[in-house]
Amino acid sequence: MSSLSSSLAFVFPGQGAQAVGMLAELAAAHAVVRATFDEAAQGAGVDLWQLSQHGPAEQLDRTENTQPALLAASVAVWRVWQQLGGTQPAQLSGHSLGEYSALVCAGALSLHDAAALVAERGRLMQSAVPAGVGAMAAIIGGDDAQIAAVCAEVAQGQVVAPANFNAPGQLVISGHAEAVDRVLAKLTGMGVKQAIKLAVSVPSHCGLMREAADRLGERMATMRWQVPTIPVVQNADARTYHTVAEICRALQRQLYQPVRWTECVRVLAAGGATRVAECGPGKVLSGLLKRIDKTLATHAIGTPAELDAARAEWA
């Protein structure tokens, strides 16, 4: 039986962490990886392992495929950690889609149901806004309050607002494409370090997703939920909830409200976390963690070498 550590937290990545070939090395060493993908595929209705290993990338990057594939990947890494007797974290959190991975690992929802749910989430998000109508942009080196004020100033009746508070000085905005362009033009004129439109087809975490969130809530209501066995810090309010109804409402709101990632990480730290493992493919969150709180010891654990290093250091 592995021990519980109050100083250990796990975080789970969102869209953008996917890559063709992800977890191939881990799957070669641990049969549970492929089994986890196959289990998720039953819920999603897509051969997630084939898609993850062979692509093509443009199919893997379709949000209705990306979401269940990343969910499967993160849960697979978690299960490997469990099989190896890794120390149990006292807190979990996930970035956007990663919140669903965290809830599965905390026992709130089965992997099968979660895979079906996030595939539907992807379809609802994709169909919520016609192609070309929405956009997202990353802004590096700006002040959060100033950027929010510019969004309000240039909206002109359209939707544009902060979508991801990823780290200090690292913000993503989302909304109508024309309004996003106006914000970028204004910020560039104000001397913001970097402002780049993202190659995404869906303007996530803004008011354009409210109808999709309503329909997502209807789908959630058909599924079996449990109270998590490990606290999950949720994005919408950077806090944990202790009833199924509150958890589901927070998941709905997450679709049209910003991901408060900086605050989520600070809540983990305030709750006693000094070590944080990134549970899934890639190292996107590890980079953000270092920008948010340099005192946190971080490890990605998506490869055998990374797992060995984390277990050796954190045994």
Regions found by a protein language model. Name each.
Residues 2-147, 194, 198, 275-308:
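FabD-like malonyl-/acyl-CoA
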Residues 82, 188, 269-272:
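Non-catalytic positions within long, well-ordered alpha-helices that form the structural scaffold/packing
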Residues 69-76, 253-261:
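A short, flexible low-complexity segment enriched in Lys/Arg and Gly/Pro that occurs
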Residues 179-180, 272, 304-305, 309-315:
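NAD(P)-dependent dehydrogenase/reductase Rossmann-like domain
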Residues 15-17, 42-44, 106-257:
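Alpha/beta catalytic cores of group-transfer enzymes, especially the acyltransferase/condensing modules
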Residues 256-273:
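A short, acidic, amphipathic alpha-helical segment used as a generic capping/interface helix at domain edges
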Residues 233, 252, 265-269, 286, ...:
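Generic hydrophobic alpha-helical scaffold/packing signal
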